[in-house]
Amino acid sequence: MKKIAVLTSGGDAPGMNAAVRAVVRYGVRQGLEVIGVRRGYSGLIDGDFVKLEYKDVAGITEKGGTILRTSRCEEFKTEEGRELAAKQIKKHGIEGLVVIGGEGSLTGAHLLYEEHKIPVVGIPATIDNDIGLTDMCIGVDTCLNTVMDAVQKLKDTASSHERAFIVEVMGRHSGYIALMAGLVTGAEAIIVPEIPVDYSQLADRILEERRRGKINSIIIVAEGAASAYTVARHLEYRIGYETRITILGHVQRGGSPTAFDRRLALSMGVEAVDALLDGEVDVMIALQGNKFVRVPIMEALSTKKTIDKKLYEIAHMLS
């Protein structure tokens, strides 16, 4: 193998740049030519390629986002789109592809291998942390720290005004960020997609806390469980006083990656190049315990990852 490519796809996650840097520098050290694909699968279809040298990735580890840029490509979801992408790969003599992204991106990588035998290796990067068979995905730790910092600041104003704040965080199918943020900030309630919410019970809990002298409440809700506005409407009707809403939105995707995310990304990038050189393809690099392992992409994607319900119970006990 002499020439490989790397792309970032889907929603950006802090640490993607660190992974790109590792793939490029380690690849070059192994005697490979490394090509960067701009704009994810859209760039793959369009042939938007750039050769990346050692110096081109200097100073990017600490930067959020992705220097390669990213996109969500509807055309790639079609067989025709993937065929165009495969033709570009073969036309440019690319012998292996590293895909950095979440569920949709990794599915696309698998399909490239299944349909066109393009050697692919996936690196899980999504703040939702909803990819199976890996303990952590790139970007999760940074996102969690961003949410924690925001909630701590909201607690200051919530206590000053004796209010209930509802904080909506990302997590369409997974409540991981909501759960962990709620646990480490001492939120009074956590609402996640995996566990149905009982609004009457939630209201009773907040009212009981008020009777005990607690003057403020923080409720953290994952976007996939309910919107903050829906939660506010249900609560205000039951508790009889106004709430305030904060939707953190895309700020959760940004920022300089934490030390943990940098180390995770760098290690996964190196392991991805090694996997290609070893001929072990259609796999995803996963963190299991303290070890980096290679697992079949579709096995990872078909393994449902849920929150730790015992931890959920503990979070409410400690609030």
From Swiss-Prot:
Binding residues annotated for ATP, in chain numbering: 11, 72-73, 102-105
PROSITE patterns: PHOSPHOFRUCTOKINASE
Binding residues for substrate: 126-128, 163, 170-172, 223, 244, 250-253
Catalytic activity: beta-D-fructose 6-phosphate + ATP = beta-D-fructose 1,6-bisphosphate + ADP + H(+)
GO molecular function per UniProt: 6-phosphofructokinase activity; ATP binding; fructose-6-phosphate binding; metal ion binding
GO cellular component: 6-phosphofructokinase complex
Record: active site: 128 (proton acceptor)
Known regulation of activity: Allosterically activated by ADP and other diphosphonucleosides, and allosterically inhibited by phosphoenolpyruvate. Strongly inhibited by diphosphate, triphosphate and polyphosphate.
Annotated keywords: Allosteric enzyme, ATP-binding, Cytoplasm, Glycolysis, Kinase, Magnesium, Metal-binding, Nucleotide-binding, Transferase
Record note on temperature dependence: Optimum temperature is 93 degrees Celsius.
Stretches that traverse the bilayer: none
Residues engaged in binding Mg(2+): 103
Protein family per UniProt: Belongs to the phosphofructokinase type A (PFKA) family. ATP-dependent PFK group I subfamily. Prokaryotic clade 'B1' sub-subfamily.
PANTHER family the UniProt entry points to: ATP-DEPENDENT 6-PHOSPHOFRUCTOKINASE (PTHR13697:SF4), PHOSPHOFRUCTOKINASE (PTHR13697)
Function: Catalyzes the phosphorylation of D-fructose 6-phosphate to fructose 1,6-bisphosphate by ATP, the first committing step of glycolysis.
Quaternary state and interactors: Homotetramer.
Descriptive protein name: ATP-dependent 6-phosphofructokinase
Species in which this protein is naturally found: Thermotoga maritima (strain ATCC 43589 / DSM 3109 / JCM 10099 / NBRC 100826 / MSB8)
Gene that this sequence comes from: pfkA
